[in-house]
Amino acid sequence: SIRSLEENLYDYAQKKLRILSGLYGILKPFDVIQPYRLEMGTNTVNLINSDLYKFWKEDVSKTLNEEIKNNGSAFLFNLSSKEYFSVINHKKISVKTINFDFKTKLNDEYKNIGMQIKKMRGSMAKFIIDNRIESIEPLKKFQVNNFKFEKILPESNTLLFTS
């Protein structure tokens, strides 16, 4: 929750954090919206003659690029799910996208555990805002709920954290 931040970080979060939405496209933390339940993958062809990915792709990508330019950001830190991030036209993003993966060791094998991943994405977003992180190196210091930095997967620009 945005309210878990120190008040002096509200402006920074409002400037830097974006939330992808199936209904609203792209949101800032303090945008006022009505509660809703609509997944990006919901079949909307009969309603809007398009799926939500196609409907939002150009607007969301254009808005993100404008905000990246206005904020002077060097990276786009992607903490969204693959489902939601596929709404972005990656070829049109003007900076390098940094992805995150959180895996848990179970029976000598690393696995993604859905609810843990959601919690860790939120924790990482808070860590980035709390520390005003705008480069890759400080992200490696993230340690929450036994998750710690493992390595960078260069082929996908992914920072892997394991527990």
Protein language model regions, located:
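Internal, well-folded beta-alpha domain core
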Residues: 2-155
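Short, basic/aromatic-enriched C-terminal tail that caps enzymatic domains
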Residues: 156-163
